[in-house]
Every structure is written in structure tokens, then in C-alpha cells.
Amino acid sequence: MRICFIMYPWKTVDPLYDSTLRVIHECIRRGHTVAIGTSSNLTIRGSITQAYVDVFVKQAKISNNFKVFYKTAKFKRCQLPLSGFDAIFMREDPPLNNIALNFLDSVKDDAFIINDINGLRVANNKLYTASFNDEQNSFIPVTHASKNREYLEKVLRECKHDKMILKPLNGHGGSGVIVVEKKAISSFRSLLDFYISGEKQDYVILQEYVEGAEQGDVRILMLNGVPIGAMKRIPAEGELRANVSTGGSVAKHTLTKEEKALCQFIGPKLVNDGLFFVGIDVINGKLIEV
């Protein structure tokens, strides 16, 4: 197969932790032709959607050491039509560029795009968890999204617990995630000044604090709506966020009864939305993010 990965720049890949690198490695190990590129290198020439990509040069031996594989990879620069690929993985960090998705629209009938373009659009930020209609909050923590300061302050004051989680709507990798306390309204106002003031006036998420968050979260990989693996992510000392990018560590994890029930609850909708290959972040059996 000919497989293209639309991703972040190759030079930014951390071979010790990068999940896309591992998918690429497995594709090459299985004998597929693999190309990588960024959305900024998508082009249209004569009504044909193309991309400047780097095609991996096949080598006699493929190292199973990801650091060695990364450092020894060789490429051939090409300008190729996207319709010539059998599969296209969209692996850029969210929020995805809508123009890039428009480029992919033109080849969605020629190549299998992972994930489906419409699915990528509907799940392009943290509002997607609200679409599961978990009215009893059995699987999804109570979540508020707004850029109205009065409303956000009211939510924090009326919260049943003494703290909540504040984060930007379009953040990723744990960036901007902060614990806010009910007793510290003045500090909360200062945070809102940072997040929703100025020209952009971005939306923020104010979410129920799930007990156990300080011990980390669980990243579950799902394929076709079914969990295929999981790892426990443990935050560094003094850190709330468990992301590896913020110093967190990982450990093997066996799904709990509650986590399996969560996967059964969200799996059908993920598939229906065309989200075939996803990672979900879970704390104490509750879905934090897709």
C-alpha cells in the first residue's frame, strides 16, 4: 500500500514517545510505501490536489529501536497527487486547519482517510464530548463551555465541590489546564483575563474536577469503536497534567470494568462519526477528552 501521513514537522518528533512515529515504523516494517508531509505543503495544480512529501527510502534493515529508526531515516522529496495514495493519516495536532480539511475533501473518494474528514471536523475541539448525550453524567464529567465571564464565575461559585478544571477549548497536550478553587475567585478572574480577553476572546472549558486526577489518567486507544490497548499516564511530582510532554511517565494498564463500560458507551458513535482510530483520555472511568 501507499500511505501518506499529514503530520507535524519531522524535526519536531520525539522518537522516545511519539505515537505517529510508531505507526509509521509499523507500516514500513510491513513493507508499505510511506510518505510524510505537513498541511502547509498541500497544493492544487490543474484542479488536482497534490502535496510536497518526503517518501521514506526503503532500507535493507529496519531498526526496532525507535531512536535509531528516526535518526537513520532517509527520504526522497516528491510532489505527488494525494489521489495516488491508498490511505491518508491525518495526524496533525488539534485544532486542525479547516483549509487543510478542504484540500482532503477533494480526494475523499480516492483514498481512505483516517479519520473521516467530517469526523475530524465534528471532533476538532473539546466540545465533542458533549455530543454523547450523557445526561446523567455517568461517563462524562459535568462540563461548561463559554466565554461569558459572568456565567463562568457563577458556575464556579455554585459548584458542589471546592475546585474545578479550567482549560482552553482548542488546547492540546495538556497546555493551559489549570485547577481553579472556589475560594479564589479573584485569581479565577485573572485567569479569565488571560484566556478570554483581547481580540481573540477564546472559549474556555470549565469542568467538574474528577477525583483521582492528581494520580494521572488513562490513555485508551480505540480502533473501530473497540479498545485495543491502554496505558496509565502518571504526572510528574507537583504537576496535575499527566501528558508525557509535561514530564509525565507511563505504565502498562489493564482496563477496569468502568473503563470498559465507557468504551462500549462511546464506541458506536465514534464509528458512526468516522472516528476509526482515536485515543481517549479517561480519569476514574470518566471521559475527559477524545
Predicted ranges, named:
Residues 1-4:
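Extreme N-terminal starter segment of soluble prokaryotic enzymes
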Residues 94, 118-122, 233-236, 283-285:
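Short glycine-enriched loops at secondary-structure junctions
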Residues 35, 113-115, 165, 205-207, ...:
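Structural detector of well-ordered beta-strand residues that form the stable sheet scaffold
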Residues 232, 268-290:
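Conserved metal-phosphate-binding beta-hairpin within the catalytic cores
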Residues 19-20, 149-150, 157-162, 170-262, ...:
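Phosphate-binding site of ATP-dependent enzymes
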